[in-house]
Amino acid sequence: MTRSLLVPALLFTLAAAAPPALAGEADPAIKAQLDSLDIKYEVDSDGDFKITFDLGGGRSQLVWIRSSTEAYGDLKVREIWSPGYKHDGKQVPVEVANRLLESSHSLILGGWTKQKEFCMLAVKIPVNATPKQLRDAAEAAADAADEMEQELTPGKDDL
C-alpha cells in the first residue's frame, strides 16, 4: 500500500474503532478526521465541533459536528447541525415551518428540526463515515442552511 493511501486508511480504521465520546467530551475520531482535512474548528462546551464555513460572496455559515452519537439496532449515527433560521424562541411561524417541511422533502441529506430558538438542518451520517464523507455532509448542511437563511431573512448573514 502506498504511503498516500496508508494515512487515510489508518484514519478510517481509528475512527471506526474509537469508543463513543461521552457527553461534553470531544470525539477524538472526529478531531483526527477534521485535522486530516485541515478544517479549522473550535470545540464547544458540549464537546461538539463548531466550524465556520466561508461560502464566498461575503457569506459564512456555522456548522456543528456532534461528538455524541445515537443508535438504532446496529446502526450508529452522528448528527451535523447548521442553523438556517432564528425565531423568537416560542414557536416557529407557520409559514416558515411549512417552507422548512417543503425544503426537507427535496434535500438529499438531512431535514429541518427545531432546536431552542433555531431551525437547524440536521444531517445524520454513519459514525464510521470517512473523512471525505464527513466533509461532504458538513458542506451540504452549510450550503442548504445558508440558502434557507438567505430565503427567509434576505440580506442577513447572522448564522
Q: Where do the PLM segments sit?
A:
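Soluble non-cytosolic domains of exported or imported proteins
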Residues: G24-P28, K90-Q91, N128-R135
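Bacterial N-terminal signal peptides that target proteins for export
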Residues: M1-P8
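Secondary-structure transition/turn motif
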Residues: T52-G57, W81-K86, V123-V127
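Sec/Tat-exported extracytoplasmic proteins
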Residues: L37-Y41, F53, S104, A145-L152
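Short, internal acidic amphipathic alpha-helical interface segments
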Residues: K76-C119
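N-terminal signal peptide c-region/cleavage motif recognized by signal peptidases
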Residues: T13, A18-P19
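N-terminal secretory signal peptides
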Residues: L22-G73
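C-terminal partner/receptor-binding element of secreted or periplasmic proteins
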Residues: L121-L159
